[in-house]
Amino acid sequence: MKKLARLTALLLTGALLLVLTACGAETEQQAKQRLLKEINSYRASIHLDPLKEVEQLSAAEQELIEHFRAAGKTVLPKSEADEALDDWGSATEGWSYYDDFGLELSTGESGEEIRFLSAKVPANTPEGKAELWAALKGSGKFMDEDCKHIGIAVVTIDGQMYWSCCIYN
């Protein structure tokens, strides 16, 4: 009887782990696709064509924000981040850059210039969608009818997902 109880407990534990894995957190790739879908839904709501993701541009964007992941922080000195921006510039050469979102330039507490990731991936809920649409609208960067292409990337730092993108004509 005890063996049957142990076996049942073991099977239930395994089933629970399987369910938790299947219902687990969104991956970076899933978050990226959801963000792109929401950006294009937002653009459709204001009667604009969708932005087409270009793998070359997304790869450049991913490489850029991977520097933050490698450092394990969302803020880098401008000089360090600018090295990554030089590589990004080479990778996106020939594309007509319009604007970017999620990577900011500011002055740190010590007076040095810093670059930081500012756009957290919102929860995959109605509230998260509303938060994202408010950010898209408030930025004014997704409303140009001449923009047709996007490079978009997501990284996880300290358990929080951040995203950035660049928009091109």
Describe these PLM feature segments:
Residues 1-11:
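Bacterial N-terminal signal peptides that target proteins for export
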Residues 19-22:
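C-terminal motif of bacterial Sec signal peptides marking the signal peptidase cleavage site
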